Amino acid sequence: MRRFTISALACAVAAAAPAHAVITFGGVIAVPGNAIDLAPGANPNQNRLSFGSDMVYDQGSATFFGISDRGPGGGTIDFAPRVEAFKVDIDPSTGAISNFNLTATKVFHRPDGTPFSGLFPDRLPGGTKNALGNALDSEGVARFSNGQFLVADEYGPSVYLMSREGRFLRAFTTPSNLVPREPTPGSAVNYVDNRDIVRSGRQDNRGFEGITLNGDGTKAYAIMQDPLLEDGVGTANGRRSVNLRIVEFDVATGLATKQMVYQLENRTSINARIPGTDDDFGENAQGRNIGVSSITWIGGTKFLVIERDNRGEGPDNLIAGLRPVGSKRIYMIDIANATDVSGTVLNTSNTALPGSVTPVSKLLFLDIASALTLAGEVIPEKFEALAIGPRLNDGFALLLATDNDFSVTQNGSNVQFDVCFGTGSPTQVALGDPCPAGKVLVPTRLYSFKISGADAANFSASLFAVPEPASWAMLIAGFGLTGAAMRRRRSIVA
């Protein structure tokens, strides 16, 4: 495996001078697409492993916690979203990773034990379009020092506090302007339909995509994947806008205290990196096919954000035919001077903001696509998880994970198929059937980078604090990483 050092100065030109970290690629683990987790079951709709929708790292137990999304089938299968605990070996000198070990699986559930479901709300028993019920599309995760989780849901969008066992504890209050509503009298809430019917709030399948906590756990920050339906000009319903929102929550009350603007990279700049013009992103792709996948606090008022397009290795793209990738990037942002836009509709321009509004500042931290191209690696579609790992001898580890969509696609009749690729053209087989010879399911990919250099100082020392042994031992036991669960762990070596 090739390892090399990337200066963020040389990654690509950002809107402003990029950050000055020294970033070294540490390698990749491909977790097989047919791997299973530790939940009961015997088919892909029950326990196929997928953990790359977001992840967080616990320094005390050296454990990563990654979450699934709503499951295979895109909201048409009763899959129980969950959190997966796993460990990897990380070389203290290079940051190279190896030996993926799944140690526990916890399904998100109500206090009575009823699991949350990836089904659209109106597909739940007795469900309607107007209430979420037990519907959950988990896309972001943060973790408190006591082992509890904050989960960002895309359906609402919602933020839920879960116990370390995955039990629902309480919901935060979603700002009213983010809730999807119809334009009819009364502005009925509608969590299911698209922009043909819903005219304000989050776009369909574009709710909260990431969540993070500040250093003392008093504030949470949830980020939208794309602009709101009303945040833009004309009839495109946000799809031509670059302006999406970050919401600051007070953890104690669960109330939103601020909304800030994050500006996506303009598609013109992205198109300039794509050969020719045949594969350029059109106007309606700006705020729909280009978006944000993750947010991670790194210290003070600074965060890392993954921004990406919808191209690259993934089940649907493999079947349709891969197109040139334009954007897989990590930006360092600072919210210190960002204006509160809680009461502001951003409908005067798709790009420019009113003079009274200052967005979060933004510097390029890492061009993921360029780094992987230099390393001779494939570029997956969905980079959705970022975690600050352990300290190394010189710097620290940063890990990324991809969402492989369970290696599943579906047709217009909502019939699911496994996508197999490898030798020859990609093929589809019945869900759960073996792949043809020479082909495999799309894996979840886990990447490591070593971060060092002057700007590593932007990362708070609290990110690397290790609790007293007695404290974290209790948390590990509470999550089920000892005893029977440890004896059942799965080891995947790459």
What feature does the model see in each segment?
Residues R489-A494:
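Short, charged juxtamembrane terminal tails flanking transmembrane helices
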Residues S7, P18, T63, L475-G480:
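Hydrophobic alpha-helical segments
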Residues E468-M486:
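A short, hydrophobic C-terminal helix/tail in secreted or cell-surface proteins
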Residues A16, A465-P467:
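Selective for proline/serine-rich intrinsically disordered segments
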Residues M1-H20:
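Gram-negative bacterial Sec-dependent N-terminal signal peptides
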Residues A21-F464:
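Sequence/structural signature of beta-propeller domains
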